[in-house]
């Protein structure tokens, strides 16, 4: 069986592990995009420390869970979004105003929608976490 969307698989694995009460989770295969999404989640306090482990194949991320994630998921298709449209997408994917983050891939890297609004840049929606 082939893995069609590694990011969606990683986020659902994190959500399921949180619900069961696990303290750490191993995500494979690892990629730069998954690493950047984990960095944004760590910055906002949704996960603890994470590290890349080279297993000779694609690699593995070991992630410490803090029990703060209610739901995390990938956004498919990757909708393009302008700075003025973030509020519309926030209403669609997040349960309440200013609760949770949308993760956006921009020309300046992967960041939350709050950072993108501050910098005044748009991008493509890739994930949500709350």
Curated annotation (Swiss-Prot):
Gene Ontology MF: a single term? structural constituent of ribosome
GO annotation, cellular component aspect: ribonucleoprotein complex; ribosome
Keywords from UniProt, A to Z, are: Ribonucleoprotein, Ribosomal protein, RNA-binding, rRNA-binding
Single biological process term from Gene Ontology:
translation
Top-level taxonomic group: Archaea
Which InterPro entries does the record associate with it?
A: Ribosomal_uS8, Ribosomal_uS8_CS, Ribosomal_uS8_sf
Give the family from UniProt.
Belongs to the universal ribosomal protein uS8 family.
What is the purpose of this protein?
Answer: One of the primary rRNA binding proteins, it binds directly to 16S rRNA central domain where it helps coordinate assembly of the platform of the 30S subunit.
Matching entries from PANTHER family are given as:
40S RIBOSOMAL PROTEIN S15A (PTHR11758)
Subunit record text: Part of the 30S ribosomal subunit.
Mind telling me what this protein is named?
Small ribosomal subunit protein uS8
Q: Taxonomic classification, please?
A: Archaea, Methanobacteriati, Methanobacteriota, Thermococci, Thermococcales
């Amino acid at each position: 069986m082939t893995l069609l969307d590694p990011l969606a698989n990683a986020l659902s694995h994190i959500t399921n592990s949180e619900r069961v009460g696990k303290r750490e989770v191993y995500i494979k295969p690892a990629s730069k995009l998954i690493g950047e999404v984990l960095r944004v989640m760590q910055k906002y306090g949704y996960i603890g420390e994470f590290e890349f482990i080279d297993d000779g194949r694609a690699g593995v991320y070991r992630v410490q869970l803090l029990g703060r994630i209610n739901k995390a998921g990938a956004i498919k298709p990757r909708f393009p979004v302008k700075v003025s449209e973030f509020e519309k997408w926030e209403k669609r994917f997040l349960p309440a105003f200013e609760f949770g983050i949308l993760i956006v891939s921009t020309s300046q890297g992967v960041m939350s929608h709050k950072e993108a609004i501050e910098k005044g840049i748009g991008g493509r929606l890739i994930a949500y976490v709350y």
